């Protein structure tokens, strides 16, 4: 008797009996192919597409904060005055982690109270030699000469302001107060603010670096952008690096820029002084409390009321941190974009600042810096906004901590890797292989 409804006998197909184990062998081959593809996938540059996973909280002891060591321009853990003090790793020059990255604790920033010819030749090679710490008393170059001796309780770390009096507002005092501020110039004209994070590296926003056939230079140690000073240096830019995920527009309107960050590598390193000093980068896992008072510094809009630029000398303005959810809600009402679309994402941070026309910094990448126990951290860089005349809309800064791994990868000289496919695509590909294996 034939099977009901012409059903095939198990183990046989319309063309005859199946070969035992053929389907299983084909499935195994497909799975091996999938494993090979996963092994060959290029590594994703950290900090460009995904948010780094937060490390677990540790109440006791608190993990050390990660800081720039100005003498070398590399990441290292070290001590600082006050409650942020940590233990230095054993032995001089010890790097943290496999690539020199040290674990960072949760930094909760509290509320705060309120012309000479520029040298264009590279400095002496001995001056440019990398420095290393010697115990806790001083620094030496690679030749063994003592360059500077410091007290053990006053080690020279990043984020040190060299002007303690906040009432002084003259240009020279402003340079000492914000020694990491540099002017990024294209073909001799100021276009954006930059932030010194190492002797040969400047951080800025990507939308200032999108021009072609431009000669970039960086002016450091000067409060003016239209003249030099005895403390200033103009250094040509050797290399421009823009985050490969940068998008000038995230949506169909003016709202938002994505991954608006870039790096400038200088042709030679700057010599540190009280007018030239790097700022600290916050750790991967840190918190800036809502309503905390921070500072925006820079030169403002490059062209205001027909006058270029808005300010010739360095300016500063205090702003307060705005809750991200409130900021996102405001922009949904302001732009009429669907509430299903998230406008303010984890790579952004909002600030409350009224009367921005007086100091309009919306398109020139001015930094947002916050102080904790006397140490200054680069929290954000001005990315986008609706315009300084619409002061009711908060300015949106790129959140620097999100891009800390990307910055370190570029500074450590790792090759630029292609972005890896998302987990969703990998899962879909795996399901497709399983379906093919059952045929």
UniProtKB/Swiss-Prot annotation:
Ranges per topology, Extracellular: 48-415
A cellular component annotation (GO) from this entry: membrane
Official protein name in the record: Probable threonine protease PRSS50
Glycosylation sites: 116, 187, 226
Cystines in this chain: 192-208, 294-370, 327-350, 360-388
Membrane-crossing residue ranges in chain numbering: 416-436
Compartments where located: Membrane
GO biological process, one term: proteolysis
Biased composition (Basic residues): 51-61
Annotated catalytic residues: 207 (charge relay system), 260 (charge relay system), 364 (charge relay system)
Low complexity: bias regions: 9-21, 112-127
Source organism of this protein record: Mus musculus
GO molecular function per UniProt: serine-type endopeptidase activity; threonine-type endopeptidase activity
Highest taxon of source: Eukaryota
């Amino acid at each position: 008797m034939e099977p009901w409804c012409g059903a095939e006998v198990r183990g046989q197909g319309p063309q005859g009996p199946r070969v035992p184990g053929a389907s299983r062998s084909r499935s195994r081959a497909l799975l091996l192919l999938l494993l090979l593809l996963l092994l060959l996938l290029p590594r994703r540059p950290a900090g460009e597409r995904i948010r780094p996973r937060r490390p677990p909280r540790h109440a006791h002891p608190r993990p050390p904060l990660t800081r720039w060591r100005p003498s070398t321009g590399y990441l290292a853990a070290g001590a600082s005055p006050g409650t942020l003090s940590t233990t230095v790793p054993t032995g001089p020059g010890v790097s943290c982690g496999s690539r020199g990255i040290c674990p960072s604790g949760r930094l909760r920033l509290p509320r705060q109270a309120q012309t000479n010819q520029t040298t264009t030749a590279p400095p002496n090679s001995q001056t440019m030699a990398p420095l290393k710490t010697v115990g806790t008393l001083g620094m030496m170059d690679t030749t063994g000469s003592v360059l500077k001796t410091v007290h053990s309780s006053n080690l020279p770390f990043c984020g040190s302001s060299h002007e303690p009096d906040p009432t002084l507002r003259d240009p020279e005092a402003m340079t000492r107060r914000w020694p990491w501020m540099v002017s990024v110039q294209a073909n001799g004209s100021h276009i954006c603010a930059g932030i010194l994070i190492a002797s040969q590296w400047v951080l800025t926003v990507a939308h200032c670096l999108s021009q072609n056939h431009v000669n970039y230079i960086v002016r450091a140690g000067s409060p003016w952008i239209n003249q030099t000073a005895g403390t200033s240096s103009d250094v040509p830019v050797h290399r421009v690096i823009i985050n490969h995920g940068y998008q000038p527009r995230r949506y169909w309107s003016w709202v938002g820029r994505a991954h608006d960050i870039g790096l400038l590598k200088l042709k030679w390193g700057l010599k540190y002084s009280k007018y030239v000093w790097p700022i600290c980068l916050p750790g991967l896992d840190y918190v800036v409390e809502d309503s905390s008072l921070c500072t925006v510094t820079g030169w403002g809009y490059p062209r205001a009321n027909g006058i270029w630029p808005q300010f010739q000398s360095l300016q500063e303005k205090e702003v307060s941190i705005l809750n991200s959810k409130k900021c996102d809600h405001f922009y949904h009402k302001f732009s009429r974009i669907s509430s299903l679309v998230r406008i303010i994402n984890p790579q952004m941070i909002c600030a409350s600042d009224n009367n921005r026309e007086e100091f309009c910094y919306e398109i020139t990448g001015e930094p947002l810096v916050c102080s904790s126990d006397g140490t200054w951290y680069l929290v954000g860089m001005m990315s986008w906004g609706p315009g300084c005349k619409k002061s009711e809309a908060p300015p949106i800064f790129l959140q620097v901590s999100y891009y800390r791994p990307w910055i370190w990868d570029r500074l450590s000289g790792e090759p630029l890797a292609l972005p890896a496919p998302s987990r969703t695509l990998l899962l879909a590909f795996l399901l497709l292989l399983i379906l093919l294996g059952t045929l």
